[in-house]
Amino acid sequence: MWDVFLLLVATMAALDDGVVVGVGPRGLVRLPLDRHVVITGPTRSGKTRLAKRIIKRSGLPAVVLDWHGEYSGVRLDARLLKFDVGKFDKKLLAEVVGLGLNLNEPSIYFLYRAIKSAKISTLGDVAKALDDFLVATRSEVEMKAAIIRRLEYVADVFERGKVPVEAVFKTRRVAVVDLSKLRLYEEKVLASLFVLASLYNHLANRGVSKRPNALLVVDEAQNILKRGDVVRYLFFESAKYGLRVMLVTNEMPPGDILVHSYVVMTRPHFTYTFSAKRSALIRDNKVEELWII
């Protein structure tokens, strides 16, 4: 009965006061949504379960990048999404594609040179621009061939999509992008980066917002946080447009991510820099232990 009462109180809590995530020594513990959120903890410590509760209690429309098919909502197979990459700035497109394919910095710059004057609307157009790009040295010939091979390896997955990704952003419900059907790790990373960049563009066109108006939940976030500065840029800049990114990860993110985030630790681990005996909310350099509800 007590558990039911706590859940009812948590659900009724006003968004302005934050979302209830647990009970501490001084009562209910609320997670503010004026910053991004990191949910971290070892495997099978309840990270996904907590993320689902925060989504529900916030009442905000949410887009979930679901790596393993664990979230509920309006589900959409990632293979059905259509990305209009022509709407991306060419430098951003080169970075997103390059990081998704795990290219090094010289290869990303080469990719940018190949596409900067080309008309691009699909990944197939990116491959064609590369193929048409004139090179002068043996090293450039080899670099060009290597990039095309990697791109063709994953491009066909993104050529069959029929549902514009913008339709996902316009729903007022929880939209779950199911990445579990994608076979390759690179496909999942690239799809995640495309969604993040597309959502950033979508919200930027709507203008600055002083209040949170949408959630982006990134499951297995450690897989994209390792992909370079452009991910951090999109992460940092998105907050001013009302987007709150919730990173669900079993690794403690880098310090520059933590500075912009509240951290909920579902279970302590010796590799984490924060010291706590149980689950905890870390904000403003203070660790508040709690029992998650």
Label for each model-derived stretch:
Residues 12-80, 224, 228, 244-248, ...:
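Glycine-rich phosphate-binding loop of nucleotide-binding enzymes
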Residues 32, 36-45, 181-277:
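Conserved P-loop NTPase motor cores
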